[in-house]
């Protein structure tokens, strides 16, 4: 809130000026002095223009997580924003790029933001820059700001929004923190600031509307969220949802009217002193908005006029259709009319300014002006609140070739959600006559034109007219193409973004539930191993969070080479059950089974064998495949022998078991994908010695020759990448399905429906634990899927043009939503997750059967059988079952489709029958193996271990399992 810090000291600070490490940094024409703010993606510093000795704000945007294409798109957007010159919008002055940051030089606003202004309302009378304002317009004893100040800020905010509407732009993140304040122009004349802000124009700090003696409002942070990764909808949801429109909170498509809701919330906070709806997360916020039913109540002590309250209520309508339109908002008496309650001094100044503006408008109306095509026209008079025209060098986003990269195939941002409202009509964009008007004009022209010889001047005029028509046609075609691209772009990417946000939002809601928190606290008393902590950063390195913003922003080019040995105990200490005699033996055995089967798929090696590699092993050291998700007691009934009669379960417990079953299947698929992934991003020799190291592959290192020198050929990298990608996508679908079932269960709980009389009070807590695990795993898989996609694209570019797997060749299919990214992702024909999983399960069951016959590693055989069953259950799992809930979803995953010839997830009816028979045969083998192990354990005096050499003597060998052959799909 303090005005300026540097004027009290020197404009340049020496190295030994008390701040130790704090030093001035010269950035071209500017000097960065000290930090004045910090956000999610950037740090704001106060700076000085070296030549003019005026203040600027330098915003350092961290670009370490951006690949080169995203950097180029950001630069293009910045160049466009330089043309948005308006007194009530913080101007982008300059841009300077370093190796790790892009420094955005912007106008400096000395009074901070509006949220700080409201919070410090009681101390404004003591500040030298606001003392006179409070003396004239004191704030009410209770509530927010004086209504004169509120209306003054509203007029300036409306002026900026009206300017943005002429450009078909929406801000999408209006909130008090993004509304910056500058002292009135009289402050500089009085010399209260020794260093004045840098001006991009003479009228940069001259208000268009409002009272000249009051602070000047400017909209900040406009447009940058559209270009930065993992922003837009996702960042806003995670950042400050208090000012978001309900249609955004409902994940619906929204238009420019979302800004009007934000204006209503900001206006309410200025009047009352707090936001109209307050909640801990956006789920509770939406619930409060819906429960309010558009009944906006003001505290009794609020000093606000009825017109102002009416305007706020008309803006805070849940339904965008019922919400006040922009036209009515700009024409409302509160925005357009005079401000009541002005003191005589300001009232006289207001009248003088209105007279000057009226005289200026009259002179301007008397002069003709030229349109963009060279014709003369008369401009209508503009009101005092109308925005000033942009400078002649302003680059229109709608017609700039650079902007056409947004939403096109050249834009590589996978996670962006296109939410900017654009119009295909070019009339409002360019100010030129529309195509229909030109046709009418051309049709009427020959009627009034007298025949005669064509003069050179007339020929030039005709040429200009034809060129203008051609230019209009080109602009219209460009706009249509761009609109189509944006529609396709939003349709393709909003699914991934929305799903990631929904998963994290539901996990947040469940973790914040008081009933679950109380149960978890009760569990911590008798047991040291408590529940999973909300937002536990188990999916990546400790410095990264698992929020949707971080997960999506780093998914573009970040992957994590981390062993999971050390993380197994920390992640799953909520569960008691683990397969095998110890956690390490189970994971070791199943890892061995996965590794042995990795080179024998389909008769050829889809996972590259050692012959394809220059060095290294497959898979690398440090991989623990299973079980990363241990089940609770009693959940082995699905894979058991069926002879053990289970007690009847209540509905809550059934839902819990179904959720855990699907989550376990997803973990098996994840473990299979990890075998591929670990070969794409192997551990370095120094990291293999210490399995606790979790290296992070930065986006800039991914494309370097050193990072790609993994000992794999290009063909091997291509095969591994596409196999890992389809497996990760399958794991994501299973994780989403388990979350959908949990969400349906939770919704019925909140509606008060009696689902079941569960004798186990910990069922809800266990569901919460599963949901938190699924959330963390979902974010991790999303990151690794994006890394696999980038590796696949890189391998495609390195393949020869005539190679069968080159992107230009035919016979390829896409991989769902991921394939519609700007860098087209294509998967080789015949490569599906279901086929990979089927062959892997088949290979594992065969290997386990051989080991069982020879008496080798019987506990490992048991785990291999169970893993194969889980993987085949995942093959039978249908994406169409996602809408099912409760027991129906679990049954759908374990039964064959009734449609004999119908195709589900690429599997024909006969193929599903083969898979079901294979599951049944493996279950029989598992039952026999369990009986054998139980008998051996009973006969031995040492229950810990039985020598493999004595195994055949203790139990006669079982018959070889009947394993059906894979069908040609």
Curated annotation (Swiss-Prot):
Segments forming domain Protein kinase: 30-335
Q: Which residues bind ATP?
A: 36-44, 59
The record's section on CDD domains has: STKc_ATG1_ULK_like (cd14009)
What do the Gene Ontology cellular component annotations say? autophagosome; cytosol; phagophore assembly site membrane
Q: Which GO terms describe its molecular function?
A: ATP binding; protein serine kinase activity; protein serine/threonine kinase activity
Where does the record place the catalytic residues? 173
Q: What is this protein called?
A: Serine/threonine-protein kinase ATG1
Specify the species: Coccidioides immitis (strain RS) (Valley fever fungus)
Q: Which gene encodes it?
A: ATG1
